[in-house]
């Protein structure tokens, strides 16, 4: 079956956005951003959201659609992004999914049936109260009893997902491991072709990440953080957890220097890129384009185009 959707994936700073726009021109597509933080308004610099010039006239969806004070879940993202995908297909265009948030992209392609529960639900509120009163230790211990597989996968500091796993159990009687296993057995909602971007040498990827962070600082990342503070964005907002914002919030509060914040952002970004690659390697269907010392976009675009054309895309 000819793929309905093109996915452009890869770790941060590998040129996904540029490739996605080029493929949209080539295959009559529109870009759907699959980035858990580009959904927020007023955070264009730190999330590397595309500028109007970088969009090159290609419609972009799921960029700057939410207030930073809102808390978004993967379930909500998939629900709203799916509306975009369906609309693009209905108009005879091709959705080009671009981003590095692997869970969001995989869930959208699979049409994941999310378990019950929401961030504002009664069960979540009770668990949140327990977290504040008891700390994460007892909650993680409870999860280890209920769903040892899930507990083993989660980092002890990943409070959000620990609470989610417990919430699923309390509301459905099914562990999140059982739910995910059942979901994976279902046929995917969409047929997709995957293009993966990275570097042959991991050191080059790290260098590109450092250069990107330096460029964000020059563009005004600190000023963007200060603007969010001035707008009254509460320190508990999920948006502050984005790499770059969390560290520069600390600098704005005087808890560290700007120089220390920059180095921390670079470190966290490199660690995130490593996790992204680990996730992507789970998918054997990705057609990888590995850059040399610098990205060769004309050559990479030709490579991607030939691969997609061979799959039947026109």
Predicted ranges, named:
Residues 1-314:
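Phosphate/pyrophosphate-binding catalytic cores of soluble transferases and nucleic-acid-acting enzymes
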């Amino acid at each position: 079956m000819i793929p309905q959707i093109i996915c452009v994936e890869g770790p941060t700073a590998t040129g996904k956005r540029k490739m996605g726009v080029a493929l949209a021109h080539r295959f009559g597509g529109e870009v759907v951003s699959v980035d858990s933080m580009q959904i927020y308004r007023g955070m264009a610099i730190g999330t590397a959201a595309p500028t109007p010039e970088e969009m090159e006239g290609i419609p972009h969806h799921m960029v700057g659609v939410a207030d930073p004070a809102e808390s978004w879940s993967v379930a909500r993202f998939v629900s709203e992004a799916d509306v975009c995908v369906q609309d693009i297909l209905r108009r005879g265009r091709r959705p080009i999914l671009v981003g590095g948030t692997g869970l969001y992209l995989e869930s959208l392609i699979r049409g994941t049936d999310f378990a019950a529960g929401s961030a504002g639900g009664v069960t979540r509120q009770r668990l949140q109260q327990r977290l504040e009163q008891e700390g994460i230790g007892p909650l993680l211990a409870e999860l280890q009893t209920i769903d040892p597989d899930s507990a083993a996968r989660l980092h002890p500091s990943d409070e959000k997902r620990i609470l989610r796993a417990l919430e699923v159990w309390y509301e459905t009687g099914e562990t999140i491991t059982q739910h995910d296993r059942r979901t994976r057995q279902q046929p995917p909602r969409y047929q997709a072709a995957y293009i993966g971007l990275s570097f042959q040498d991991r050191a080059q990827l790290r260098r590109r990440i450092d250069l990107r962070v330096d460029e964000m600082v020059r563009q005004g990342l600190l000023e963007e953080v200060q603007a969010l503070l001035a707008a009254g964005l509460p320190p508990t907002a999920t948006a502050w957890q984005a790499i770059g914002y969390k560290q520069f919030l600390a600098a704005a509060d005087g808890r560290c220097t700007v120089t220390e914040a920059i180095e921390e952002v670079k470190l966290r970004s490199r660690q995130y890129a490593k996790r992204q690659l680990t996730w992507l390697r789970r998918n054997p269907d990705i057609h990888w384009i590995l850059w040399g010392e610098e990205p060769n976009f004309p050559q990479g675009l030709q490579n991607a185009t030939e691969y997609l054309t061979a799959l039947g895309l026109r």
